[in-house]
Amino acid sequence: MSGPAAVIAVTSLSLEARIALGPGVSVICGRASHIVSRLQAAIERGTLGIISFGVAGGLAPDLATGDCVIGSGVHTEYERYPADRRWSRRLLESIPGSVHAEIAGVDAPIAQSSEKVRLHACTGAKAVDMESHIAARIAARHDIPFAICRTIIDPAVRDLPPAAVIDLRDDGTPDVPAILHSVMHERNQIPALVRIAIDAWTARNALLRDRQLLGAGLGCPYFDERASEPVRVGVFATTQLRPTGP
């Protein structure tokens, strides 16, 4: 934690964490199942805001690899958590060409393009990830400002092969033995993995550029003002949604 009032960035990949880390920013990294306890512990040390930062899958057909999405909020199946408007506006102003849109929060990877089309149609979300809804839920519980900054890695038309959706290790690094095992058993996924590797490189460069544009505190306006005036934030609302199925 960089001081008692740093911004907390929530990521899954260790690569995302390395990019996010900087002045005024601490990082929670790892599998979604471990984020809750780690984020709760970090909040106890004090924070001015929580941001979901990293890569995301594309749901809208007009988004390409490397495009930046600033979340207006995140949907789960039954709930919607809005992002802090002031922070989101700062992010949009800082990153040229960024898109302001809803994010879908899921608990399992969305691997097939047909699933992406369905999720986009059902929710209107333009991107999907597995961390934003977890971070948003905890931020809402503690009335902490929340934001989303995500870069598209796999566009809506891209199917992900089995090796690409294997769970990460606890520290946010790829489980290389499991990936190799998958490839050895299904060698026909190699061309798709090569395409994904190219997408990942493009997304990584875009994410690094966006991070540099945001500067200290990842664009959090409350971080900028902490030395000159008290932080005042409103109640973080949660909207209950009806189930889409029976």
Give the residues covered by each predicted segment.
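Glycine-rich phosphate- or other oxyanion-binding loops that anchor nucleotides, phosphorylated ligands
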Residues: 3-246
